[in-house]
Amino acid sequence: HKNFCKEDCLHFLQCLMECGWTPDSPADKYGNTSLSVACQGAGYEAGVCAVRYLVESGADVNAVNMQGQTPVMNLYGGRFWDGNIPRFAGFPRSYPYGGRSCTDEDAETLELLLEAGADINAKDNWGNTLLHYIAGSSTRGSKEAAALVMDFGSPDVSAVNNEGLSALDIAMEKNDETLVKFLLKYS
């Protein structure tokens, strides 16, 4: 996506729409819609442009992929995960979140999705909410993202996933002191 400029992206999407393509159709083998794929590439100008175009074209901001992940979860690092936990100590532990290091600029894309009605309490197949994804993404901008989510409603800060972990637990594991302090105010 790095070399795909904003104008090319818009032209490509417009051509697809003119040919009868619908943005809510699965765009990859994991069942991600084009909006979810664009959210995964939101760190690039073309990705942000695609997200805006797709939202303005009526893409479903709450469409889920085979993992139960919404586009906003993919913005904050959602990735394919088969649910298996490695049984050997030498293998790193993996999660469905943390697949992308997020930046401060992602707040603009997050706000766009929230304004379009993204569900802040949706859960993926493993019980993770948007706050779990934000906590697992990176320490840069995580508190600001969580604060923006709070501005759009009352997410369940104490919600635990299928492993019994809350967003606060994940933030503590990542040593994200700023997010930990912020989430403690709402716990």
Question: In which residue ranges do the predicted regions lie?
Answer:
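Low-complexity, intrinsically disordered tandem-repeat tracts enriched in small residues
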Residues: 10, 26, 57-59, 63, ...
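Ankyrin-repeat-protein effector appendages
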Residues: 91-93, 116, 162-165, 170-187
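N-terminal segments that cap or nucleate solenoid repeat domains
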Residues: 12-26, 30, 34
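Ankyrin-repeat boundary/"N-cap" motif
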Residues: 1, 26-40, 64-79, 90-97, ...
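Ankyrin-repeat and related helical/solenoid repeat scaffolds used for protein-protein interactions
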Residues: 121-174
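N-terminal start and proteolytic maturation junction detector
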Residues: 15, 85, 93-94
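Ankyrin repeat domain, specifically the short helix-to-loop turn at the C-terminus of the second helix
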Residues: 14-22, 52-60, 111-119, 147-156, ...
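Ankyrin repeat A-helix N-terminal signature
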Residues: 1-8, 37-47, 74-83, 95-106, ...
